[in-house]
A protein has these predicted regions:
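N-terminal amphipathic/basic-hydrophobic helices that include classical n-h-c signal peptides
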Residues: 1-7
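Extreme N-terminal starter segment of soluble prokaryotic enzymes
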Residues: 8-13
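Structural alpha/beta surface segment adjacent to cysteine/selenocysteine redox centers
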Residues: 18, 24-112
Length: 112
């Protein structure tokens, strides 16, 4: 029998890159968590590519060997968690414009 999750704080900051397949899977898992628990997730968008540049590292998504593992991991985790998932064949893509759109909607159209 699985243990009951206990949260010390009812608010959790969730940092995500808007185009990340891992962020998508995590978002779906979060939706299941908030249905059953009294916990609130603060979505905090980040540009993961910018963090890679800042740390002066190559993103795994641009490594032809690592991208296969990333795809396999996403498919495995989504299947295990019963999450419908299809790998975006155009991944990785530049998320800057999508992020700007997200921030605009978040700031100006809060009623959505």
């Amino acid at each position: 029998m699985p243990k009951e999750l206990v949260y010390m704080n009812n608010q959790i900051d969730f940092y995500f890159d808007i185009i990340s397949p891992f962020s998508f899977i995590a978002h779906k898992k979060i939706q299941k968590i908030i249905q059953n628990k009294k916990v609130f997730f603060n979505y905090k968008p980040i540009l993961l590519g910018g963090l890679h540049k800042l740390a002066e590292i190559d993103a795994p998504a641009f490594n032809k060997y690592k991208i296969k593992i990333l795809q396999s991991d996403c498919e495995l985790v989504s299947e295990k968690n019963n999450i419908s998932f299809i790998w975006n064949s155009k991944f990785p893509i530049n998320s800057l414009y999508m992020m700007r759109g997200y921030l605009y909607v978040e700031e100006n159209l809060k009623e959505l």
